[in-house]
Amino acid sequence: MENKTGKYFKYAIGEIVLVVIGILIALQINSWSNKNKNDNLEIEYLRGIKTNLISDLIELEGHFKADTTKLNSYTFLIRALNSDSIAPNSQDLITNFYTSVGYSWFEGQNVVFEDMTSSGRLNLIQSDTLKYSIQKYYRLFNEVIKQEDLYNSEIKKYSDRNSQYIDVSSFIEPMFNTQWNGNTGPPSLAFMEKPNFNQVKPKIINNLSLIKTNRRNSHNVRIQIYQKAISLKEMIEMYLIEKK
């Protein structure tokens, strides 16, 4: 009887051990599966952020060209208005008034980062250094947008002040096709021939200089985010190579 009972207990213990081993194996397989899934998600998210960074770089390079053109135009106009030798009908003067009009802003692409943060998946990034670098970039990203809003509001303010002296419509209307053209005629610099021009000229120059300053400030913050985007893109590329 005792031998049968002993055998029964040994058999039961053996069964329990086998069940436990089976559970542990299943848990291990599940753990491997989850890790593999998370690794794949991490890679896909990082590739997505890299794609967004490339879009940022392309957009910023376009802004740099526009910034340079406008800064050159402001400089030309300030120098021309400070000179007594330039004629009101100068084509160079008209061209630079054209190119000096308007302002732009950095929009950027942050959809992948926003998806990661809103879904709580930012911790899928296993490298703390890389994760913190990404967070730091997008903090700067948001700060650049805020600063550009400020600079653009200043540019608009000083542009509006100059519009009271300059026939702005004569520069704007020719940009429209025949259907929407207001027929204001060719761009007019007649304001330079008015009797009070010498009194208002310093105000126009000051406003142009302030517009130029805010444009340069906007350009400088764009350079900051551009450099950070290049650095972060390279960091992601190196990390993805190491993951292979």
Mark where each language-model region is.
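Hydrophobic membrane-insertion alpha-helices, especially the h-region
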Residues: 13-28
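Long, hydrophobic alpha-helical segments that serve as membrane-spanning/inserting helices
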Residues: 1-6, 10, 31-244
